[in-house]
UniProtKB/Swiss-Prot annotation:
This protein's name: Proline and serine-rich protein 3
Compositionally biased intervals (Low complexity): 40-56, 128-140, 185-202, 368-377
Residues forming coiled coils: none
Name of the coding gene: Proser3
One annotated Gene Ontology cellular component of this protein: centrosome
Length: 634
C-alpha cells in the first residue's frame, strides 16, 4: 500500500454545484523521490462538493481521507465508483498500462544490473526490487523518466486505478521475462538469477550449459536478436547438485524401488530374510497338482522361494509376523492379500500354534480349479477349510486350518517325513485323471483330526465343495461315458469296497475318480460311496456329473450338522444329505420361477453354452487332424 499524503502541495481545484468534482492536476516533479509518487497515488483533497459561490482557491484545511490503510479492496472500489469522473470506453481502452510506463521496468545504469553489449532487458535483479516506494534507494533514477511516468499516469486517471494491482501485474510480467531469459541462457550473467515468486518446476536449466560451446554461436530464444552472448560459465548451484543432494532424484529413486517391490514376484510374496517352512525331503515342501497331463512338481528347497511355474501350485512360507504360525498358500481365483495382482493365489489362514507341535504332519493338497480343466482332488484330512476356484467368501477366523501342520525347523522331523511321503503317493496325476486309479493307491491312512474341527468347519467345507462342483465340472465335454468306462466303474467299487448311496444320487464316471482318491481315517476300511452314471439325455448328464465332486471328510449339510462321534459315520451321513439337497435343487432348477425373464435368458444361454461346449472337443480334434495332415504334406 502506498502511504497517503495528508498535506497536498499546490493543488488547485474548481468546485461547482452542478457538476461533479474535477480531477486534480499533477504537481511538478522536483526530485526523484518516493514521496512524489505517493502524492500522485492518492487524491489530495476531500472530494466534497462545495457551494456554488465557492471560487478557485487553495484548500486551507487538511483533506479528509476516505480510505484508510485498513480498508478493504471493496471499499476502495466503492469510493472510486462514487468519486471517479465517467469516461467513455474509447478513452479507457488505449490508456492501459504498458511496460514502458513504469520506471521499475526500465533498464538501469546500476552496476548490479549491467548486461552485455546490446542487451534489451535485464536478466539480473537490480537494486530496486519492487514498486514499493519505501525500498527505493537507487540514485540512478533521473527526473525526466519520472515526469514522463507522471504524465502518462495523469492521462488515464492514475488516482482512480488500483496501483497495487498494477504493480503486482508488472512484477509478474517482469519475472516471466526473466524466467524466459534464464531458460534460454542460464549462465549469461555474472551473478545468480533470482526466481522469487516462481514455482520450482518453472526454473530449469540447460543441461548443456556445463559443456564448452562456441561463444559466438547464437542462442535460440534469446531476449534480443542482436545480442552478443558471452561464453557460458559453470551453471548455478541447482544445476550441479550431487545425486545425494537432489531431492527430486532421491524421490524418483525411492518411487522406483517401491514400484519394483510391488511388482516383484508376479503375485508371490518373497521374503528375503525369512526362511521358508519346508522339510528335508524336496517332494514334501510343495506339491504342484497341475492340469491333466502334468506330474507333481516341487518348488525349491528351504532357503529360497521360487516363482510358481504354473498357476496351480501352492507353497508354504513364513509370513512377516511375530508368531510362529505359517501361512498356507493354495490356488484359487482371488488375489494375494499382500500383493494385489490378478493371480490365482488364495491365502488359507494361519495354523494354530498347538498343531505345530504334533509329530504326525500330513501334507494336504487342495483342489485346483483350472479355467477349463478338471479339478483334481487328493487326500485331505477332515477339517479342510478351503476356498476353491469360485469366488466364495474367505473362511472366518473361527475355523483353524490344520490342513498342513509341518513342524518348525527346531522341532524333530523324524516321524513326520515317512508319513508325508506316504500320503503323497496317491497324488500322482496320470494323463487322464478322470479315470479311477488302481485300488492299491485308494486307501491312505491319515490321523484322526476330527478333534480339531468344529461344526462351522464342516459346514464351510460342504458349501465350498458344492460351489466348486457346480461351477467347475469335471470334464471339458458333456458327453455320456462310453460302455467300457461303465464296466470299469462297475468293477472298481468291488475292489475298493465302495458302498452305494441312495439311487437318487446319480453321478458321472468323472465324479467316481474323485471319490476314489479321497483319504479315510485309519480305522475306516471302506472309502467313500460311488455310483455309476444313469443319465438319459445329453442335457441331463452335465447336471448329474457334478452333483457331488470331491467328497471329503468334513463335508457337512447346510441344514443338519452331525457331531463328530466317530471318524467315519458323520462324513457318510452328511454326504448323503448333501446329495439329496443337491439333487432336489437341480431338479427344481427349471421348474421354479419359469416366468422370470432373467432366469429364462440365463437358462437359454446355459443350454447354448452346454451345446457349444459339447461340440468343442470334436472341433478341436478335427482341426488338429487337418493341421497334422497339412504338415505331413508339406
Amino acid at each position: 500500500m502506498f502511504p497517503k499524503v495528508d498535506n497536498p502541495l499546490g493543488h488547485q481545484e474548481t468546485r461547482t454545484g452542478a457538476t461533479r468534482s474535477q480531477r486534480p492536476q499533477a504537481p511538478k516533479a522536483t526530485a526523484a523521490s518516493s514521496d512524489e509518487l505517493s502524492e500522485e497515488s492518492w487524491p489530495s483533497s476531500s472530494w466534497t462538493p462545495s457551494p456554488a459561490s465557492t471560487t478557485e482557491g487553495q484548500s486551507t484545511s487538511p483533506p479528509c481521507n476516505l480510505i484508510d490503510n485498513e480498508d478493504s479492496i471493496v471499499a476502495k472500489y466503492i469510493n472510486r465508483f462514487r468519486q471517479a469522473q465517467p469516461t467513455s470506453r474509447e478513452d479507457r481502452q488505449p490508456a492501459g498500462p504498458t511496460s514502458a510506463d513504469f520506471w521499475w521496468l526500465q533498464p538501469t545504469a546500476d552496476s548490479s544490473g549491467h548486461l552485455a553489449a546490446g542487451a534489451g532487458e535485464p536478466t539480473g535483479r537490480s537494486a530496486v526490487t519492487g514498486p514499493s516506494p519505501t525500498g527505493v534507494s537507487s540514485t540512478s533514477l533521473a527526473s525526466a523518466p519520472l515526469q514522463k511516468v507522471k504524465q502518462s499516469l495523469n492521462s488515464w486517471n492514475s488516482s482512480l486505478l488500483d496501483l497495487e494491482t498494477l504493480s503486482l501485474q508488472s512484477r509478474a510480467a517482469r519475472l516471466l521475462k526473466r524466467s524466459k531469459a534464464s531458460l534460454n541462457d542460464a549462465s549469461s550473467s555474472s551473478f545468480p538469477i533470482s526466481s522469487d515468486g516462481l514455482s520450482p518446476s518453472s526454473v530449469t536449466f540447460n543441461p548443456d550449459s556445463n559443456k564448452s560451446s562456441n561463444p559466438k554461436e547464437p542462442v535460440l530464444g534469446a531476449p534480443g536478436p542482436s545480442q552478443a552472448i558471452p561464453a557460458p560459465r559453470p551453471a548455478s548451484s541447482q544445476a550441479t547438485l550431487k545425486p545425494e543432494d537432489d531431492i527430486l532424484y532421491q524421490w524418483r529413486q525411492r518411487r522406483k524401488l517401491e514400484q519394483s517391490l510391488q511388482g516383484a514376484g508376479d503375485g508371490t510374496w518373497v521374503l528375503p530374510r525369512m526362511p521358508a517352512l519346508t522339510t528335508q525331503t524336496p517332494p514334501v515342501s510343495a506339491v504342484n497338482l497341475g492340469s491333466q497331463d502334468t506330474q507333481p512338481n516341487c518348488t525349491a528347497p528351504c532357503g529360497s522361494v521360487a516363482q510358481p511355474p504354473p498357476s496351480q501350485a501352492f507353497y508354504m512360507e513364513r509370513p512377516p509376523l511375530s508368531g510362529p504360525s505359517p501361512h498356507i498358500w493354495a490356488p484359487g481365483t482371488h488375489g494375494v492379500l499382500w500383493a494385489p495382482q490378478a493371480n490365482p493365489w488364495v491365502s488359507f489362514g494361519m495354523l494354530p500354534t498347538t498343531l505345530l507341535t504334533s509329530t504326525l504332519a500330513p501334507l494336504a493338497s487342495f483342489p485346483v480349479p483350472p479355467t477349463s480343466t478338471s479339478t483334481t482332488p487328493a487326500p485331505t484330512p477332515t477339517p479342510q477349510v478351503c476356498i476353491p476356484g469360485p469366488p466364495t467368501s474367505a473362511p472366518p477366523p473361527c475355523a483353524s486350518t490344520p490342513a498342513s501342520t509341518l513342524p518348525l525347523p527346531d522341532t524333530p522331523q523324524g516321524p513326520a517325513i515317512p508319513e508325508l511321503s506316504s500320503s503323497i503317493q496317491p497324488k500322482k496325476v496320470g494323463p487322464k485323471p478322470r479315470r479311477v486309479s488302481t485300488s492299491s493307491h485308494q486307501k491312505t491312512t491319515v490321523p484322526d483330526t476330527t478333534a480339531f474341527e468344529g461344526p462351522c468347519s464342516q459346514l464351510r467345507g460342504a458349501l465350498s465343495q458344492v460351489v466348486t462342483a457346480r461351477l467347475f465340472p469335471d470334464s471339458p465335454e458333456d458327453t455320456p461315458p462310453s460302455e467300457a468306462d461303465f464296466r470299469k466303474v462297475q468293477a472298481i467299487p468291488s475292489q475298493a469296497k465302495v458302498l452305494r448311496p441312495p439311487p437318487e444320487s446319480r453321478r458321472g464316471s468323472k465324479t467316481e475318480s474323485r471319490k476314489s482318491q479321497v483319504t479315510l481315517p485309519a480305522d475306516a476300511g471302506d472309502p467313500q460311496p460311488a455310483t455309476a452314471p444313469k443319465a438319459s439325455t445329453l442335457l441331463e448328464v452335465q447336471p448329474r456329473e457334478f452333483k457331488m465332486s470331491a467328497p471329503r471328510m468334513g463335508a457337512g449339510d447346510p441344514l443338519t450338522i452331525v457331531p463328530p462321534a466317530s471318524s467315519h459315520a458323520p462324513s457318510e451321513d452328511l454326504l448323503s444329505q448333501a446329495t439329496k439337497l443337491l439333487q432336489a435343487a437341480e431338479d427344481s432348477d427349471g421348474s421354479e420361477f419359469q416366468e422370470d425373464p432373467v432366469l429364462q435368458l440365463l437358462r437359454a444361454q446355459r443350454a447354448e453354452l452346454r451345446q457349444q461346449k459339447r461340440w468343442m472337443p470334436s472341433y478341436l480334434s478335427s482341426w488338429t487332424t487337418l493341421k497334422t495332415r497339412d504338415l505331413r504334406l508339406l
